[in-house]
């Protein structure tokens, strides 16, 4: 009679190998999950930038969210919108500048603490005639939050203004 099966040592080796793989893979998995959740931020900011750009060219001024036609992801609420992972907050225009768009984490995402923020300061440069003005931007993020969204800073490449301050 022929016996088939695995020896105890073979099973233990397989269990040890699976344990090592799990120890390496689990932290990476959580990092990837946090980055995928945070990927919503650059997408929402990019939509806002496109709408604000069009409004500035047409109106020669910065516009509020309602004027430019922007609605943050999620359910509209006072001063912005509320999504599952982020609050999106509208800023105030002062002298054609301001931090007019913010995202605030509703939960901890890796090194980005709960209530960590991403912000987008907006200003105007150019002439006073219609179509001569351009919006300029500056991005900022709370400690640990920017690392989750490397594409957030790239949204404004070529249109950065060092004179703007991002108020988080």
Predicted stretch roles:
Residues 31-74:
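Conserved hydrophobic/amphipathic alpha-helical signal-anchor segments
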Residues 57-168:
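Periplasmic/extracellular, small/polar-rich flexible segments of pilin-like filament-forming proteins
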């Amino acid at each position: 009679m022929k016996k088939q099966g695995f020896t105890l040592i073979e099973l233990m080796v397989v269990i040890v190998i699976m344990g090592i793989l799990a120890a390496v893979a689990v932290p990476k998995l959580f990092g990837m999950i946090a980055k995928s959740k945070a990927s919503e931020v650059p997408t929402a900011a990019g939509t806002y930038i496109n709408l604000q750009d069009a409004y500035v060219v047409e109106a020669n001024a910065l516009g509020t969210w309602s004027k430019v036609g922007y609605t943050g992801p999620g359910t509209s609420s006072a001063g912005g919108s509320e999504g599952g992972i982020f609050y999106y907050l509208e800023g105030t225009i002062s002298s054609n500048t301001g931090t007019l768009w913010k995202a605030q984490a509703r939960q901890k995402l890796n090194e980005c603490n709960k209530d960590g923020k991403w912000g987008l300061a907006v200003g105007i440069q150019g002439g006073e005639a219609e179509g001569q003005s351009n919006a300029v931007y500056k991005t900022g993020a709370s400690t640990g939050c920017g690392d989750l969204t490397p594409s957030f800073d790239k949204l404004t490449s070529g249109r950065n203004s060092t004179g703007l301050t991002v108020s988080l």
